[in-house]
Structures are given as C-alpha cells and as structure tokens.
C-alpha cells in the first residue's frame, strides 16, 4: 500500500522515445512567434556550473527520426510556418546519429514542403569543429545556433571543468 510523499524520485531517466506528440490544436498559434520541439535530453559534458547533467544525465537520449518527422508533420498540418526552436540543451550531443539519420531526414522532409520552418537550437562550441555537421544543419534549415561561451579565460574555464572551450581562440 502506497502513501503520498513530498518528493517522488526515480533512479532512471525518462525514456524520451515514448514522449507523445504535442497537441498543437490546443493552442492559438497566432499568439506565438516560434514553436518548440525537443530531439534529445542530456549532455556528454560535465561543466561545474551546469545543472543539465543532474536533471537529464550525461548520456544524450534521443528521439528517432520517425518521431521527429511526426512532430514536424503535426506542426505543419496545424498550419504552422516560421520559427521552430529545437530546445535541446546540446543539440549535437549525439553527432553520429544527427549526421546519419536525423538531419538527412529533416532535409528531405523540409525540401518536399519548401522549407516551412526556420530552425534554431543550442549547441556546444565544438560544433565549429565539424564542417560536415554545420553544412547539414544549414541544409536542414537552421539559421541560428545559440552557443554558450562563458569566458575566453582558460584558467576560469579550467576552474569550472569547462574543457570543451580550452585551447580554443574565442577572442579572435
């Protein structure tokens, strides 16, 4: 027999692949400048100041291409055209899957519909090291990527375990 608690916890992260399609018909899309979807949760990095790994874990958990395409289709069928923010904490946490499956599927889907969405997301600065990934993102319709750059000072980055920006010229 169970009893009510103040806080409920789990040892497992939620399975993002079981997330249902949003019910876009419940909102008045005319009142929004952008819609949001999520492809992944979690981040492979361990920056001291960031709570993402505490909330969502180190291993990026992702939706599959069919889920992403179903979400795009649902938005499209509801009449949405315009900004679409992919709200992942680090969209490029699983680069291999993005390049092999997700981005090619988005490119094909978007091309058939004359690119109805202008995509934006958040990514780690190491996106700049992957020309192929950047080109695929552009082809998919990404026009903006928010990149968190805390400081160009390597000592400060080292103090907070932010190793992704070390030995990188962020000032130039």
Q: What would you call each of these model-derived segments?
A:
Residues 17-172:
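Radical SAM [4Fe-4S] cluster-binding motif and immediate context
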């Amino acid at each position: 027999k169970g009893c009510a608690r103040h806080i409920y916890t789990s040892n497992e992260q939620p399975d993002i692949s079981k997330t249902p399609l949003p019910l876009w018909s419940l909102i008045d899309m005319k009142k929004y400048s952008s819609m949001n979807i999520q492809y992944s949760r979690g981040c492979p990095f361990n920056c001291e100041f960031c709570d993402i790994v505490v909330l969502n874990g180190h291993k990026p958990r992702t939706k599959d291409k069919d889920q992403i395409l179903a979400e795009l289709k649902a938005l499209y069928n509801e009449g949405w055209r315009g900004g679409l923010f992919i709200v992942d904490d680090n969209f490029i946490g699983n680069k291999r899957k993005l390049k092999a499956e997700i981005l090619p599927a988005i490119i094909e889907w978007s091309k058939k519909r004359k690119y109805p969405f202008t995509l934006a997301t958040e990514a780690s600065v190491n996106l700049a090291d992957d020309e192929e990934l950047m080109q695929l993102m552009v082809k998919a319709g990404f026009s903006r990527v928010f990149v968190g750059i805390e400081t160009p000072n390597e000592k400060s980055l080292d103090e907070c375990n932010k190793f992704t920006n070390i030995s990188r010229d962020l000032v130039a």
